[in-house]
Amino acid sequence: MTTVIKNGTVYQNGHLIKADVLIDGQKIKAIGTDLEGEEIIDASGMIVSPGLVDVHVHYRDPGQTYKEDIKTGSQAAARGGFTTVGAMPNVTPVPNTAELMDKMVRENQKKGLVHILQYGPVTNDETTDIIPDYAALKKAGAFALSNDGHGVQSAQTMYLAMQKAKENNLIIAAHAQDDSLFNKGIVNEGIAAEKLDLPPVTELAETTQIARDLLLAQKTGVHYHICHVSTKTSVELVRLAKARGIKVTCEVAPHHILLTDSDIPEDNAYFKMNPPLRSKEDQVALLVGLLDGTIDLIATDHAPHAKAEKQGGMRGAAFGITGSETAFSTLYTRFVKEEKVFTLEQLLSLLTDKPATVFGIENAGLLAPGENADIAIFDIEHQREIKEDDFKSKGVNTPFTGHKVYGETVMTFVDGKVVYQRGTK
């Protein structure tokens, strides 16, 4: 069966063009004008984009499915316009053997509505210094390595891990955190910590480990990717490392450029995430880093939790917020429509072709004849209010509830199949 998406504005190769998109089965057959198909979808006034790519999600499956599972996580991704995601390995059990990795890959394929790429762990259970068999993990389907949620505390362990990752052509995506400096902190050292009388998190917990790892990456030649950079100094370190030819890339999460620690209104656990919300100076540096290419891409760090884990203030609450269903609309509304920090083309690139390129993900992040029909259609004129009742995710832990935004997902295709349509349950 053929389907033609007509009259939309298509994001292709860095440009927005008026065109139709013809889908034949699982593939894009043509992009052009006056195309015909058996089924017609009118996208007048809408943006037709490659499916968004999110290299940083937490699906909690197996082991913590009361928070999220593969089905609900991928439903949330589809509602947000994401068609390819990278799932972190902080599940129970951690997929640290070929057998466990193979099982996870098969479960992702079986239950997921979108393409789910599975991370393997840097160390066996993300906290030990035991390095698993990377070759076996890669053969079983691991697309990259991460201990996200934990920094690798031992420099020697990270050095050995980088050497082995380099041998196996695997990216290490690091959660940069020195636990001795993090010191059980909750919010950024500064305005929020003082106002709320909460334990502070110094930026040094992030920056010192980035500095260490950049030296190790320079020595080993590994592709070192930094998850959710959040400070001005982190951006400066990456900028310097890139200038020196170190193979480093990094991402920023939407909340770190949309919010600062001064936006935390009270002791509200929906504002508790790791890294924490930083200062206005840090926020500006992150935006500059995105604009000049120091920061390569945007990734959500979608981290759903049960409501009970986000009640009673920050001290006893879990770290993390959801992001799949709010990312595009909040970013578009603030930085394209209102403040004009980015063009729409720049924002779409940071969410499509750039993450696909950084991680070498084939058949993702672009619209072209012969490519997979992974497509998102966005209504950038319709305003909606972010409401908990609308979420597909089990987690509703977001500080953006009640915000009025533009850029709603109208329809999402994966391999030519509609996996989300606005107005359907």
Curated annotation (Swiss-Prot):
Q: What are the required cofactors?
A: Zn(2+)
Annotated Zn(2+) 1 binding sites: 56, 58, 148, 301
Q: Tell me its EC number(s), please.
A: 3.5.2.3
Reaction(s) the record says it catalyses:
(S)-dihydroorotate + H2O = N-carbamoyl-L-aspartate + H(+)
Q: Which residues bind substrate?
A: 58-60, 90, 274, 305, 319-320
Q: Which UniProt keywords apply?
A: Hydrolase, Metal-binding, Pyrimidine biosynthesis, Zinc
Tell me if Lipid biosynthesis is a UniProt keyword of this record. no
Pathway-wise, it operates in: Pyrimidine metabolism; UMP biosynthesis via de novo pathway; (S)-dihydroorotate from bicarbonate: step 3/3
Q: Where does Zn(2+) 2 bind?
A: 148, 175, 228
Which residues carry out catalysis?
A: 301
Q: What GO molecular functions are on record for this protein?
A: allantoinase activity; dihydroorotase activity; zinc ion binding
Q: InterPro entries given for it?
A: Amidohydro-rel, DHOase, DHOase/Allantoinase_Hydrolase, Dihydroorotase_CS, Metal-dep_hydrolase_composite, Metal_Hydrolase
Entry's Gene Ontology cellular component terms: cytoplasm
The record's PROSITE patterns line, in alphabetical order, gives: DIHYDROOROTASE_2
Q: Which GO terms describe its biological process?
A: 'de novo' UMP biosynthetic process; purine nucleobase catabolic process
Function of the protein: Catalyzes the reversible cyclization of carbamoyl aspartate to dihydroorotate.
Q: Which family does it belong to?
A: Belongs to the metallo-dependent hydrolases superfamily. DHOase family. Class I DHOase subfamily.
HAMAP family found in the cross-reference section: PyrC_classI_B (MF_00220_B)
Q: What protein does this entry describe?
A: Dihydroorotase
